[in-house]
Swiss-Prot record:
The active site is at Y153. Substrate binds at S140. It comes from the Bacteria. Belongs to the short-chain dehydrogenases/reductases (SDR) family. SUPFAM superfamilies: NAD(P)-binding Rossmann-fold domains. Keywords: Oxidoreductase. The lineage of its organism: Bacteria, Bacillati, Bacillota, Bacilli, Bacillales. PANTHER family: DEHYDROGENASE/REDUCTASE SDR FAMILY MEMBER 11, DEHYDROGENASE_REDUCTASE SDR FAMILY MEMBER 11. NADP(+) binds at residues 10-34. Its EC number is 1.-.-.-. This is Uncharacterized oxidoreductase SAOUHSC_02778. The keyword Oxidoreductase applies. Pfam families: adh_short (PF00106).
Length: 231
């Protein structure tokens, strides 16, 4: 028996990169996985590599509260429960204030901050009612370390840290766990577009392993935060 046998996990941003790696590893460890993201074709490609009776594709825009509510509802209806929710949907666009790309700022705020909040508010009522569950938010080292070209992105990821820290206090003694995972540079399509190729990077699988570590601690242990950097 694998460590997450029959656990029900929802993973946003599951069509590629970190989200895909997380969804795949959780499935390998026995979880029933709901794949969420905007691109149905990418989600289906991921699903096709997994066992069809334990995976569900639900196209979802995390900036749309109604769609996120429906995602959580479908997960429960399909697999009969809700144990794990991974907020891995994220966006990194032009982040210099002096570039004045307000539309891109709005988009990052919507995906990175509102998406995290919408998913939490949809999942937590069920988790609180059953006195169990684990919410994991994928943040970023950029939330701690701002550069001249990462101002807006860093601000959104700092918000994810703050949201997670606040939830940790709100959920104390409820049986519901919450974790923030902050990767350094990860080799994905997003980072390839914005960063030099000679910079050291993590692999998406590295972040998936950090998620699994947080999920497999004893019941009385909550891993509040994990930082993952390349060496």
């Amino acid at each position: 028996m694998t460590v997450l046998t029959d656990k029900v996990a929802v993973v946003t941003g599951a069509g590629s990169g970190i989200g895909e790696a997380i969804a795949t590893l959780l499935h390998e460890e026995g979880a029933k996985v709901v794949l969420a993201g905007r691109n149905k074709e990418k989600l289906q490609n991921v699903a096709n590599q997994l066992s069809q009776d334990s995976v569900k594709v639900v196209p979802t825009d995390v900036t749309n509260k109604e769609e996120v509510d429906e995602l959580i509802k479908i997960a429960q209806q399909t697999f009969g429960g809700l144990d794990i929710v991974i907020n891995s949907a994220g966006q990194m666009l032009s982040s210099k204030i002096t570039d004045y790309q307000v539309d891109e700022w709005d988009s990052m705020i919507d995906v990175n901050i509102k998406g995290t909040l919408y998913t939490a508010q949809a999942a937590l009522p069920t988790m609180l009612e059953q006195s169990s569950g684990h919410l994991i938010n994928i943040a970023s080292i950029s939330g701690f370390e701002v550069t001249k070209s990462s101002t807006i992105y860093s601000a959104t990821k700092a918000a994810v840290h703050t949201i997670t820290q606040g939830l940790e206090k709100e959920l104390a003694k409820t049986g519901v766990k919450v974790t923030s995972i902050s990767p350094g540079m990860v080799d994905t399509a997003i980072t390839a577009a914005y960063n030099p190729t000679d910079r050291k990077k993590l692999e998406p699988q590295d972040i998936a392993e950090a998620v699994l570590y947080a999920l497999t601690q004893p019941k009385h242990v909550n891993v509040n935060e994990i930082t993952v950097r390349p060496v």
